[in-house]
Amino acid sequence: MTLKELVVGFGTQVRSLWMIGLHAFHKRETLMYPEEPVYLPPRYRGRIVLTRDPDGEERCVACNLCAVACPVGCISLQKAEQKDGRWYPEFFRINFSRCIFCGLCEEACPTTAIQLTPDFEMGEFKRQDLVYEKEDLLISGPGKYPEYNFYRMAGMAIDGKQKGEAENEAKPIDVKGLMP
């Protein structure tokens, strides 16, 4: 080892100690997580939930658009039909171990049944526990859109009345009849 190498090595050690001394008294960036809450942006996309409409029914009509829009294929569902003709998912399953929380399922949902909440604490010890069924995903409230009801907005038959036959509702316009 030459004298030059010894001086350079000593200089790097002094420089390292100087940097440690400078940063020893700065404010720390590490948060003590459970005690200090983490800042989440206003539109943070976290845990996925299934919501209900204002009448208390499931909003999901099992259209399968969320499963098609999902880039990793973590959503699976099966359509069933009630006696009144309304569709609902017989089973609805999300595998959160594969989900990338991109929000495409929420954007694709025409009934606003799927919504992403800011909840991010979903750690499990076993991978199988990250597969959520419909009962785990359903919440009791309407979520972000409390007044929205898909069947009323879509003009589906409600209580046996077709579109335009309910109270204070105009008859639908025949778009094809207006064409030249």
Swiss-Prot record:
Record GO cellular component, one term: respiratory chain complex I
| Co-factor(s) | [4Fe-4S] cluster
Q: Which GO terms describe its biological process?
A: aerobic respiration
Domain 4Fe-4S ferredoxin-type, which positions?
Answer: 50-80, 90-119
Where it mainly occurs, coarsely classed, is membrane
Q: Does the keyword NAD apply?
A: yes
Residues binding [4Fe-4S] cluster 2 are C70, C99, C102, C105
Q: What UniProt keywords apply to this chain's record, in alphabetical order?
A: 4Fe-4S, Cell inner membrane, Cell membrane, Iron, Iron-sulfur, Membrane, Metal-binding, NAD, Quinone, Repeat, Translocase, Ubiquinone
Q: Which PROSITE patterns match?
A: 4FE4S_FER_1, 4FE4S_FER_2
Instruction: List its EC numbers.
Output: 7.1.1.-
Can you tell me which residues bind [4Fe-4S] cluster 1?
A: C60, C63, C66, C109
* Entry's cofactor comment: Binds 2 [4Fe-4S] clusters per subunit.
Q: Where in the cell is it found?
A: Cell inner membrane
* Catalysed conversion reaction: a quinone + NADH + 5 H(+)(in) = a quinol + NAD(+) + 4 H(+)(out)
- Gene3D superfamilies from the UniProt entry: 3.30.70.3270
- What GO MF annotations does this protein's record show? 4 iron, 4 sulfur cluster binding; iron ion binding; NADH:ubiquinone reductase (non-electrogenic) activity; quinone binding
Xref: Pfam families: Fer4_7
Summarizing the function annotation, the protein's role is: NDH-1 shuttles electrons from NADH, via FMN and iron-sulfur (Fe-S) centers, to quinones in the respiratory chain. The immediate electron acceptor for the enzyme in this species is believed to be ubiquinone. Couples the redox reaction to proton translocation (for every two electrons transferred, four hydrogen ions are translocated across the cytoplasmic membrane), and thus conserves the redox energy in a proton gradient.
SUBUNIT field:
NDH-1 is composed of 13 different subunits. Subunits NuoA, H, J, K, L, M, N constitute the membrane sector of the complex.
Q: Which family is this protein grouped under?
A: Belongs to the complex I 23 kDa subunit family.
Q: Quote the protein name from its UniProt record.
A: NADH-quinone oxidoreductase subunit I
Starting at the broadest rank, the lineage of the source organism is: Bacteria, Pseudomonadati, Pseudomonadota, Gammaproteobacteria, Enterobacterales
